[in-house]
A protein has these predicted regions:
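Aromatic (phenylalanine/tyrosine) cluster motif
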Residues: 5, 18-20
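Bacterial N-terminal signal peptides that target proteins for export
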Residues: 1-9
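Bacterial N-terminal signal peptides
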Residues: 9-17
Length: 195
């Protein structure tokens, strides 16, 4: 009993005598909510207008600071969802997620552009980016559970991705290529009737 008490007393003394800095990097912005900012990072990424905020996201993306670019682009969508800059913000979200290796989330971000902003100037580029992502899954990239843990490779889901591409742009340049890849995914699936 005395030994346990002595160890507890020593550990408490170490905590009191050798404290470490533990800043609370959570910030609250009225109307936006809470966000986490790593200690020592520059928090000067917020701007009062959508165009300026999108410029911050674009500059951060080209500097390969994908975390800041994601935050800035998400802020454009959260604060100014009906802005003319919202499709470009969604596009940069997809590009950042793709650069971080989160291909499923990037595909969904690109799908949001197609569904929410069908007249976007980046429509054709988005279709080709979705096609490239689906090709990576066709090549054997694994789908992830909770966006982090690689779990399985599914040709059925890959064929579904190519099918979405065909449905998004049936008369686009990418549609015939995607239709051929649907067949390739089904062939790799090896779950078809033989005669």
């Amino acid at each position: 009993m005395n030994r346990r008490f002595g160890l507890l007393l020593i550990s408490i003394a170490c905590m009191v005598l050798f404290p470490f800095r533990a800043p609370a990097p959570l910030f609250y912005v009225p109307g936006e909510g809470w966000y986490y900012e790593s200690y020592g990072k520059n928090v000067k990424w917020q701007r009062p207008r959508a165009k300026e905020q999108l410029d911050v996201a674009e500059q951060a993306f080209y500097k390969s600071d994908y975390t800041t670019a994601l935050r800035a682009a998400h802020r454009v969508l959260r604060v100014w969802p009906l802005s003319d800059y919202a499709p470009d913000a969604e596009y940069f979200i997809g590009r950042c997620l793709e650069a971080k290796g989160k291909d499923e989330a990037a595909f969904k971000a690109y799908q949001n552009i197609i569904e929410k902003y069908p007249r976007s100037s980046r429509y054709e580029d988005v279709l080709w980016r979705q096609y490239a992502i689906a090709n990576r899954f066709l090549g054997g990239e694994w789908f992830r559970i909770w966006g982090t843990i690689p779990l399985y490779s599914s040709m059925d889901q890959t064929a579904g991705m190519f099918n979405k591409i065909v449905n998004n742009g049936p008369y686009s340049d990418v549609a015939p290529h995607a239709q051929l890849r649907i067949g390739a995914a089904r062939e790799k699936q090896k779950n078809f009737p033989t005669r």
